[in-house]
From Swiss-Prot:
Keywords per UniProt: ATP-binding, Ligase, Nucleotide-binding, Protein biosynthesis
GO biological process entries: glutaminyl-tRNAGln biosynthesis via transamidation; translation
EC number: 6.3.5.-
Sample GO molecular function, one term: glutaminyl-tRNA synthase (glutamine-hydrolyzing) activity
Subunit relationships: Heterotrimer of A, B and C subunits.
Function: Allows the formation of correctly charged Asn-tRNA(Asn) or Gln-tRNA(Gln) through the transamidation of misacylated Asp-tRNA(Asn) or Glu-tRNA(Gln) in organisms which lack either or both of asparaginyl-tRNA or glutaminyl-tRNA synthetases. The reaction takes place in the presence of glutamine and ATP through an activated phospho-Asp-tRNA(Asn) or phospho-Glu-tRNA(Gln).
Species annotation: Thermobifida fusca (strain YX)
InterPro entries according to UniProt: Asn/Gln-tRNA_amidoTrfase_suB/E, Asn/Gln-tRNA_Trfase_suB/E_cat, Asn/Gln_amidotransferase, Asn/Gln_tRNA_amidoTrase-B-like, GatB, GatB_Yqey_C_2, Gln-tRNA_amidoTrfase_suB_CS, Gln_synth/guanido_kin_cat_dom
Record-linked PROSITE patterns: GATB (PS01234)
Recorded family membership: Belongs to the GatB/GatE family. GatB subfamily.
Entry-linked Pfam families: GatB_N, GatB_Yqey
Name listed for the protein in its UniProt record: Aspartyl/glutamyl-tRNA(Asn/Gln) amidotransferase subunit B
Length: 517
């Protein structure tokens, strides 16, 4: 489990090689902290009525509030508060009886007010947990990740640096700022220190963010698309000497944008910090950036402490005091959460952990479940959504759930195959027709003339012609070379353009040749 040697710089100023992962673990225990930002799927921003449509023309979804023009006052989006409470409940958090917003002061071009409205010492949700499972050689192992807090805040604008390396400001010719994103509602979920992950620290970090993503998706409060920035993760890593009660200095790797990258970033930081310490250096508290191309982190700026932001209560916003009856109503409306659904479906459908996770990763659990409810066997429903339909969704750039085909229609296609009316090849053509808006599966079958030729009289005539046209293959079959029947079946399928029942065609061929197969 060693690592290629790379170099970085320690506090002593020299280049430092990475320390092999296993060697680091012999002397140190990794301590993790994960801060996850989730863009909520509300129709308007956190403190104004501007739209939140992703991909709109730059600076077209802005107003005096999100541009911080003098005299513009914020108003809290109640839908965002509701989403925050629902997530807090799903994460087993306590919901504060009283919370308030604070100003987080810093200067950066993407923050027009020169402060961000956030929550500091009085968050809306606190003291929860999320259970995650990691596959190990000894079998699945469960970890309970403590949740320190879930708090509300507003997003920043988006800065783009043109002409620099890797989109960084260094060497850029110029920079642009799009304020469409400024003010979009964010939830920040902060874990308690994760000290018991040990050698599985990278996998635990990945499993936590994956489970959190699935949970948020089930709640329907965000699309949690990491590639679009609606789910962003900051990874804090430090090393604690084995047997010590004192933590080491932590680094924060910002905005890691995929599950795989989260795992790689944690592993690299453990190896990098181990190398720094083994060389006699000290780890610098700083912000770092993950480089996807190399799988490494690079130094950014020194890491601020809370006092650097000069938090103080926002005088323009009144405190939020969620009504207890409202909170309980929200608790009662929570959907079946992913962990409970996985346990149920795994037992009902007899799935392996990998098969189940494939469904989760494709966001296909609900679609498959609805297809099964419409009458399809679980294995067939899973096959269609994960294979053919997933490919079509990828080709058209949409989510599976956005494809113009319903679970009931998929179930009908499966039924037509099972009853022998369609082959798998013909079934794919039927699905193409449904996706093209040609109607229900049965209507597509009739309009395209796709039903399997299974009538013995019609099929028998085609079989006789195939035998006559392929005398050599027929003779081989008569002489006991049963494999040669494939050529005759192929001839039948070509003649019928794939619409023959291949199994029945094979049976008729063998009968006519006087061979048992």
């Amino acid at each position: 489990m060693g690592s290629a040697v790379t170099s970085d710089h320690s506090a002593k100023g020299g280049a430092t090689a990475l320390m092999p992962y296993d060697e680091v673990l012999r002397g140190y225990e990794p301590v993790l902290g994960l801060e996850t930002h989730v863009e909520l799927g509300t129709r308007s921003k956190m403190f104004c009525s501007c739209a939140t449509t992703f991909g709109a023309e730059p600076n077209t979804q802005v107003c005096p509030v999100c541009l911080a023009l003098p005299g513009a006052l914020p108003v809290v989006n109640s839908a965002a508060v509701e989403s925050a409470i629902r997530l807090g409940l799903a994460l087993n958090c306590s919901i504060a009886e009283w919370c308030r917003f604070a100003r987080k002061n810093y200067f950066y071009p993407d923050m027009p007010k020169n402060y961000q409205i956030s929550q500091y010492d009085e968050p809306l949700c606190y003291d929860g947990y999320l259970d995650v499972t990691v596959d190990t050689p000894e079998g699945p192992r469960e970890f309970r990740i403590g949740i320190e807090r879930v708090h509300m805040e507003e997003d920043t604008g988006k800065t783009s640096h043109v002409g620099g390396a890797d989109g960084r400001i260094h060497g850029a010719e110029y920079s642009t700022v799009d304020y469409n994103r400024a003010g979009i509602p964010l939830l920040e979920i902060v874990t308690k220190p994760i000290e018991d992950a040990g050698e599985w620290a990278p996998q635990v970090a990945r499993a936590y963010v994956r489970e959190l993503r699935d949970l948020i998706r089930a709640l329907g409060i965000s699309d949690v698309r990491m590639e679009e920035g609606s789910l962003r993760c900051d990874v804090n890593v430090s090393l604690k000497p084995r047997g010590s009660t004192e933590w080491g200095t932590r680094t924060e790797t910002k905005n890691v944008n995929s599950l795989r990258s989260i795992e790689r970033a944690v592993r690299h930081e453990i190896e990098r910090q181990g190398g720094v310490l083994s060389a006699g250096g000290r780890v610098v508290q700083e912000t770092r950036h993950f480089q996807e191309s190399t799988g490494t982190t690079v130094a950014g700026r020194s890491k601020e402490e809370a006092q650097d932001y000069r938090y103080f209560p926002d005088p323009d916003l009144v405190p939020v005091a969620p009504d207890r009856e409202w909170v309980e109503q929200l608790r009662a409306t929570l959907p079946e959460l992913p962990s409970a659904k996985r346990r149920r479906l795994k037992a009902e459908w007899n799935l392996t952990d990998k098969e189940l996770q494939d469904l989760v990763n494709a966001n296909a659990v609900d679609l498959v479940e609805q297809t099964v409810a419409a009458g399809a066997p679980p294995a067939e429903a899973r096959k269609w959504w994960l294979n053919d339909l997933s490919r079509r969704a990828t080709e058209t750039g949409v989510e599976l759930s956005e494809l113009p085909i319903t679970p009931a229609q998929v179930a009908r296609v499966v039924e037509l195959v099972a009853e022998g009316s369609l082959t798998n090849k013909l079934a794919r053509q039927v699905v193409d027709g449904v996706l093209a808006g040609e109607g229900e599966p049965d209507e597509v079958v009739e309009a395209r003339g796709l039903r399997v030729v299974s009538d013995d009289a019609a099929l028998g005539a085609i079989v006789d012609q195939a035998i006559a046209n392929n005398a050599d293959a027929a003779e081989k079959v008569r002489n006991g070379k049963i494999a040669a029947v494939g050529a005759l079946v192929g001839a039948v399928m070509r003649e019928t353009k794939g619409q023959a029942d291949a199994g029945r065609a094979r049976q008729l061929i063998l009968e006519r040749l006087g061979v048992s197969g």
